[in-house]
Amino acid sequence: MTTKLIPAQQYHDIFIAGQPLIDLRAPIEFDRGAFPSSVNLPLMVDKEREKVGTCYKEQGQQAAIALGHSLVHGVVKQQRIDAWLNFLSAHPQAYLYCFRGGLRSQLTQQWLQEAGVTVPYVQGGYKGMRQYLIGVIEAAPSLQPLLSLSGMTGSGKTDFLKRRKEAIDLEGIANHRGSSFGKNIDPQPTQINFENRLAIALLHHQLGNHACLLLEDESFLIGRSALPQSFYSAMQTADIVVLEEDDDIRLTRLLDEYVHKMHRGFIERLGLEAGFEAFSHYLLQSLGSIRKRLGGKQYQELQDIMQQALSQQLNQNQTSQHLAWISLLLHKYYDPMYEYQLQKKAGNILFRGSHQATHEWLDNYQSER
């Protein structure tokens, strides 16, 4: 058999190219974390892997290998090979990987070669590529200056970032808008997948000739996704650009994000009745998540207004009453908290301005570096 190996020196190229990858690990391993361009076509499913692992601990490697062959043979073996071949027919340049680039990769490569197809496997496997991506995140703050984009809730920071080539949208990677109402309909990635996606975004960013890395001024947690500690620490000392926006525009934007888009998304996913119920649950649960910080009286006031707005929306198909609780939430909760946090970093502020003025300032910042 000819062994075709992709060396660790090519990890960078794999992630930049979005190289199609066949992940041979068991589903339980894949679900904890993998890579965006990978598909899980396991050599062994969870129960098979568990049995082989127990055998390895109790009887050693040779016994475990023999058990693996007895579990994956005949029809089962052919089904696994067919699944790989089907994927390879659509992605003939794909690579294989298992946890460490060991026996599972080698055996799969052998079986595929016997079927007439030679497929390389990645040296070091998942573990090697994962460690490489962790290193990318740890090194990133030292490669170029970080610049933090700040602004009150509803000021349009995400929309602004999407127009900047030097920016990475952390909330997009986390699939969460950052605030207590920031949950999206689709779930957030696992912590490992969040970190892997961040690292790959950093690799792509580093290909550009950018004067800085522009990021939104985030908390340590974006929903349930935690920023890597070293990366977050570097963000806390970054220079700051503050995006300013009129209150009426902020309110209109949040009405669209919290109410119109989420309601539409739930309806499209679940239908009219179940969709509205899920949408109502999303709003009330989001408010409930900050109940302690609001205090009992303010929470109850907001909840009453929100329920009235939901009733009006259900019965009259009008959403204007939602502006009442959004306005109260901004002025009594989000804005004071934002001002308090920004004041602690006041010495780091380089510029304040509107969307247009901030774009112009950043263009000049880029050209002067």
From Swiss-Prot:
Residues 15-138 form the Rhodanese domain. GO terms for molecular function: transferase activity, transferring alkyl or aryl (other than methyl) groups; tRNA 2-selenouridine synthase activity. Transmembrane segments: none annotated. One of its GO terms (biological process) is tRNA wobble uridine modification. The keyword Transferase applies. SMART domains: RHOD. PROSITE patterns: RHODANESE_3 (PS50206). Involved in the post-transcriptional modification of the uridine at the wobble position (U34) of tRNA(Lys), tRNA(Glu) and tRNA(Gln). Catalyzes the conversion of 2-thiouridine (S2U-RNA) to 2-selenouridine (Se2U-RNA). Acts in a two-step process involving geranylation of 2-thiouridine (S2U) to S-geranyl-2-thiouridine (geS2U) and subsequent selenation of the latter derivative to 2-selenouridine (Se2U) in the tRNA chain. HAMAP family: tRNA_sel_U_synth. NCBIfam families: PRK11784.1-3, tRNA_sel_U_synt. This is tRNA 2-selenouridine synthase. It comes from Shewanella sp. (strain MR-7). The gene is selU.
